[in-house]
């Protein structure tokens, strides 16, 4: 069994690792954007969010008659696997890239398409049966997918952020108690003001962070 497969785009043929769920567009992004060490799979909430968007689009396109059921089912199953934490290692593009997220969107399209092809009984790269753009990305653009996925990723990540912020609140409150009797000059309008304690300042920071977290929870 060969260790590569040949995929084609408008720039020509390229060898893609045979075991990769991504395709030629992702391969070119890996070559063009070697900017940071932060890969898409380092942010599982964003990967899951991309799958949610593609999953919803596939079912909507099916209901509207633009995508046949077999293709929609394959896309939906591939997305569900990604939502459950599978195949994340194939989301490999650099988070810092040109094109406002186009490479990220194509990475998701190709992974979902190739996994969908396997579900349908075909080989990876046989896009005549399930295409990354024509099927997985049907009715979408990067400017639809990426902003939506980023917002979903923030929502998915918020419980972990809230836990971390509670740790910060507790630490600030503890410092407030520790320095509760240490006087300092207050500052307002770029000049000295009424004296206060260092502890009061720490407690004010703790209260501010706590209120911001509570306000965010209301909106979520």
What are the residue ranges of the model-derived segments?
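Long, non-coiled-coil amphipathic alpha-helical linker/lever segments
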Residues: 46-60, 141-197
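Conserved small/polar residues in nucleotide/adenosyl-binding loops
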Residues: 218-220
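A glycine- and small-aliphatic-rich helix-loop capping segment at beta-alpha/alpha-beta transitions
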Residues: 108-122
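Glycine/serine-rich anion-binding loops at beta->alpha junctions
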Residues: 21-22, 90-110, 137-146
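Alpha-helical scaffold segments that form or flank carboxylate-/histidine-based iron centers
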Residues: 98-102, 191-205
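Generic N-terminal targeting/processing segments that precede catalytic cores or assembly contacts
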Residues: 2-95, 110-111
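Charged, amphipathic alpha-helical oligomerization/scaffolding segments
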Residues: 52, 56, 74, 81, ...
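Short, flexible active-site-proximal loops enriched in glycine and acidic residues
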Residues: 68-72, 82-95, 119-143, 173-188
